[in-house]
Amino acid sequence: MSGHSQFALLRQRRFLPFFAVQALGAFNDNVYRQAIIGLLFYLGIDAAQRTLYTNLAPALFILPYFLFSALAGQIAEKLEKQKLIVITTTMEIAIMSLAAVGFITENMVILLIALFCTGLQSTLFGPVKYSILPSVLKPEELTGGNGLVEMGTSISILCGMIFGGLIFQIAGSHGPEAAATAVIAIAVTGNLVARLVPRVDAGAPELKINWNPIPESRAIMRLTRRTLAVRNAVLGVSWFWFVGTVLTAQLPTYAQLNLGGQQDLYVFALALFSIGTGAGSLLCERLSGRTVEIGLVPLGAFGISAFLLDLYFARPGAAPATGLSIGQFVQQPGSVR
C-alpha cells in the first residue's frame, strides 16, 4: 500500500457517486441559507431583523439534529443504504420546491419552515454518510476516504456560501426566481447521482425502530459516557461543528467590524477557514498512518480552542480602519496573524 493515494478513490464507482451526492447536498444547503440572507437584503430588511434571521436560520437547521439523530441512526441501520440515500435526496427535491415557493412569494415563514425541513433531511442523511464508508472501503482506505468526504464537504460549503451570496447580486430583480431555480436544479442533480451509488446491505434489517427519540437518545448518551474513546470523539467532533457553525454565522459581522473589511474580505476569510478544514481532513490519513486513529480527535479539538483564543487576542476590538479591500487588509499590522 505504499503507493496508495486517497485521491484514487475518486475514480472508483464504489466511492465517487456517494462523494458527489454528499458534496451536492452540502453545496445546496449553503446556497439556500445564503440565498435567504440575500433575499433579506433584496427586500430591504433592517439590520436588526437581518441579524435575527441570520442567527435564527442556523438554529432551525441544527434543531432536527438534536431532536432526531437517534431515530435517524436506527433508520440508517434498518434500510439498505443506497435506497435511503435516494429517499433523502427525493425529500430534498420536495423541500426545495417548498423553498422555491418561499423565494418567489418572498415569504420568510415558508423559507424558515423549509430550512427546518432541510435540517431534518440532513439529519436522516448524516448516519448514512458515515456508516456507508466502512461498507465500501477497505480498512486502510477508511481514513483517507473520510478525509476526502470532509474535504468535499468543506469545499462545497465554501462554494455554496459564495454562490448563494452572489445569486441576488448577479440576478438583480430576478433574484427570487434565480434562487428558486438554483436550489431545485441542484436537488434534482443530487437525486440523479444518488441512483448511481452501489447498493450496500442494511446493517440490521430486522431492527425494530423505536419512533420515540427520547429513550434512544438516552441510550446513546449512556454508551458515550461508558466508552472513553467514543466520548472524546463525540465531544471533539461536536466542538468542531459548534465552532464552525458559530464562526460562519458571525463571520460577516466580524469581517466588517473587527477586520474593517468589505464583502470580499468576508469571502476571503471564509475561504481560508474552509481551505484549512479541507487541508486538515486530507492530512488525517498521513498523520494516522492510514489507520483509524481516534486519538487525533481530542488533539484537534484542543487546537481549535487554542487558535480561537489567539484569534480573539489578535483583534479584540473594533478595526482601526473600515471599508478595506483584501489587498488593503493584508497590508495592515497583524493581518497575517
Regions from the PLM with identified roles:
Residues Q12, A48, K78, I104-T105, ...:
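Helix-loop interface residues and adjacent transmembrane-helix termini in multi-pass membrane transporters
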Residues K129-S131, S135-V136, E140, P176, ...:
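Helix-loop junctions on the cytosolic side of multi-pass membrane transporters
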Residues M1-L16, V200-G236, L257-N258, I326-P333:
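Juxtamembrane intracellular "pre-TM" segments in multi-pass secondary transporters
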Residues A35-D46, L98-T105, L158-V183, L257-N258, ...:
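Transmembrane alpha-helix termini and helix-breaking/packing motifs in multi-pass membrane transporters
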Residues Q34-T51, A249-L265, A269:
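Short amphipathic helix-loop junctions that connect adjacent transmembrane helices
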Residues L16-Q34, A57-I95, I110-Q169, A187, ...:
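Substrate-agnostic recognition of the 12-TM MFS/MFS-like secondary transporter fold
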Residues T90-E106, F302-G334:
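C-terminal ends and interior cores of transmembrane alpha-helices
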Residues R50, N55, M108, L166-A187, ...:
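A membrane-interface helix-boundary motif in multi-pass transporters
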